[in-house]
Amino acid sequence: KTFVRTALKDADESPERCTRNLVDMALHFSKGRFQQEFFEMARTMLNNDNSPYYPLIEDTLRHMDKEKLIEFGMNLGYNGCTQGAHIVRKIKRTENINVPWLFFLNIDSSYADLHSRYQAIFDQGKELGIYVYCLYTDGDPEKLLPLIEHNPDCAMILLCNSAAVTEDFAKAAESLNNMLIGVAYDDNTDTACLVLRDHRLLYSIYRMYTDTESDEILSGSYARFAEEMHCPFVAVLADPGCSASVRENVYKAVVGARVAQKYRTIPIDLFYDIERIGNIISPPSSIIGFKPDGSIYNIGSDGNPLEHNIFNESLRDILKESFSIDQES
């Protein structure tokens, strides 16, 4: 962190040089396959002097809190994809359990004591090497902030509805450095993004799409809106009922736009890109999520829903029973 802070000192005067130095430094110290592949790709992209990612980086460094960028980035890159990945691979090697590098939690914010309900899950996750969590609530996201604060070594991605992003929420979120807020794409997204930008918080937008709602993504209008909102990332997530062909077309468009550096924002597919990172860290990748009642979203190899509940079973036992290498092969 000290090295990164030192490198960021000249960010305001020369963001391009600062970015190149950070990428070169990261590539020099990177050890894992994921790190090396990621930073080699980043350096290749930044060799393009006209890359739209340069003005994106400059805007991000000027308008988002640097301590938040450092903490979230270190938690994601080091704790999650380096230190955590080492634990994930060790458990696979010694216990034959396929541990995901990230998992999703859909949380009902109306519960009176979220800490006692969920902290054990984060503790179990970290023991298994999981330091990256994607949290979603369709209720009040401010209720989740104490949970996020209590896990400062984790990178927390908090997905919420735009109407829930208020001045009070943004003010409460200012004290947290380990969180990126994902704002749902709807009629109020622009207002929510302006609030978060005013408070120098880390944010981006995400969109869940169906077969009939992919046109805006494929045409680029969704990404151009994200540019206007000054979002570092523009994420998509397929609805469970979305057809495989539409998912594949959207992912091809996401990767194509990212590689071509088409927009002043970085397109991400929350399913396929997470799966791809998982396959680099420890193949075969598993994407796991839990509903508000604790039941698991995942489908078994026989096509039937898995009957696990995170509130009744330990995470290790769930993974051992349904996500062991023998079980998946």
Annotate each language-model stretch with its function.
Residues H28-L105:
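N-terminal [4Fe-4S]-dependent radical SAM core
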Residues K1-L27, T82, L102, T191-V195, ...:
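Solvent-exposed, charged interface segments at domain starts and junctions
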Residues L102-S116, G125-E142, N151-D190, L196-D215, ...:
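Core AdoMet radical
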Residues K1-Q36, E40-T44, N249-S329:
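Accessory C-terminal segments flanking Radical SAM cores
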Residues I107, V132, D190-P283, I287-I296:
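Conserved C-terminal portion of the radical SAM core fold
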Residues L144-P146, D168-A170, R247, S301:
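A short acidic (Asp/Glu
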Residues K143-C160, K252-G256, K262-R264:
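Short acidic, glycine/proline-enriched helix-loop-strand junctions
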Residues A120-I121:
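Short amphipathic alpha-helix
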